[in-house]
Regions:
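Hydrophobic residues in well-ordered beta-strands that form the structural core
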Residues: 51, 91-92, 116-118, 248
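Contiguous beta-strand/loop segments that form the cofactor/metal-binding neighborhood of enzyme cores
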Residues: 183-255, 283-288, 292
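Beta-loop-alpha module in the N-terminal Rossmann-like domain of NAD(P)-dependent dehydrogenases
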Residues: 45-108
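N-terminal Rossmann-like dinucleotide-binding module
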Residues: 1-45, 326
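Rossmann-fold dehydrogenase core element
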Residues: 104-122, 142-143
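C-terminal helix-rich "cap/oligomerization" subdomain common to oxidoreductases
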Residues: 65-67, 284-329
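Predominantly a Rossmann-like dinucleotide-binding segment in NAD(P)-dependent oxidoreductases
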Residues: 122-195
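Active-site loop of classical SDR/Rossmann-like NAD(P)-dependent oxidoreductases
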Residues: 271-283
Length: 329
């Protein structure tokens, strides 16, 4: 599969490095708004097909699929353009600015019979499956607290009056979209749709959400999801059942997790796999594309079902906390 890259930031570096050991994927071309930027980026990986014209990039008949790691507000338009050219798409999280955009993207994927997948790396790493397998041992789940709080490297500049892209809400940026999505996504994968959502947020002087919390209500349990780009979290995410608890270190990386039961039983997961955990999502995407070539009934709504649910909740969080993007208008 010949894969083209849209976006030349660090996350594109990580994806390309993750693909290095995957025989199914060849990094084929680069798109950047500036030719010099794209050429310099491609040179690091020996990629010489570089474009600063999106139409020309997508019109290449040898291009099979596209990885999109541009700013959030670009995801929808660039994804739909790629899908309409018959290219499979792996789009960075958050896949879109809102649920409306996501639905438009899914419709384009289904119309063009191509794969659309969100690059939510933590959903595909082995640690998540380990937690899912241990859950029955906890008995009835009564409480879960997931958190992802990471002091942004760009926040000091923001406090000095320099607003970089990461703190610009005009680009569909918010703490819930940028890092809260990791914790919310995994929480919803494990526990499903909540009956109630109660959200609060810290809004910075330019309208950017710096931190937030969602209380998620269920019939038999309560959930709390916390995120922040302006503070540093030090504790694990925790699932508490009547028979015991599971603690998960760093929800987006899953380096380790521990289960302790009231009867004294203990178990531990330690990630001994690749340091770059984006290899798992890349391999699954390649497998889905290969499957699509023989199975024309592939349903993008199914592979994106957790993304759809996450956007339902994130849209409600933003509605309650007054976070509005240009894409919402």
């Amino acid at each position: 599969m010949n894969l083209g890259i849209i976006g030349t930031n660090f996350i594109s570096d990580r994806l390309i490095e993750a693909c290095a050991d995957l025989s199914q994927i060849t990094i084929y071309s680069i798109y950047s708004r500036k030719m010099t930027t794209g050429t310099e980026f491609g040179a690091k990986y020996g990629v010489t097909r570089v474009f600063d014209d999106l139409e020309a990039f997508l019109s290449d008949p040898e291009l099979d699929a596209v990885y999109i790691a541009s700013p959030n507000y670009c995801h929808c338009s660039q994804t739909i353009a790629a899908l309409n050219h018959g290219k499979h798409v792996l789009v960075e999280k958050p896949a879109a600015s809102n649920k409306t955009e996501l639905n438009q993207m899914i419709a384009a994927a289904e119309k063009n019979h191509v794969v659309l997948m969100e690059a939510m790396r933590s959903a595909y790493i082995p640690g998540y499956q380990w937690v899912r397998e241990q859950l029955p041992k906890l008995g009835k789940i009564r409480s879960a607290q997931f958190q992802y709080c990471q002091y942004s490297s760009r926040y000091d500049k923001f406090k000095e009056g320099v607003v970089l892209n990461a703190f610009n809400p005009e680009l569909s940026n918010a703490a819930v979209m940028d890092i809260g999505v990791y914790a919310l996504y995994l929480f919803l994968m494990l526990f499903g749709k909540p009956e109630t959502v109660q959200a609060s947020a810290v809004i910075l002087h330019n309208g950017m959400e710096g931190a937030g919390t969602a209380l998620l209500g269920y019939k038999d349990m309560v959930g709390t999801v916390i995120w922040s780009k302006i503070t540093e979290g030090i504790g694990p995410s925790v699932i508490q059942g009547e028979n015991g608890s599971i603690a998960i270190d760093h929800i987006s990386q899953f380096p380790a997790a521990r289960m302790i039961l009231r009867n004294g039983e203990m178990a531990e997961y330690v990630n001994n796999g690749p340091a770059n955990n984006m290899c798992f999502e890349a391999e699954i995407f390649a497998d889905l594309v290969a499957k699509k070539t023989v199975d024309r009934t592939f349903d993008s709504s199914y592979i994106l079902k957790d993304t759809i649910l996450c956007f339902d909740v994130m849209d409600e969080v933003r509605r309650q906390t007054g976070i509005v993007f240009p894409a919402d208008k």
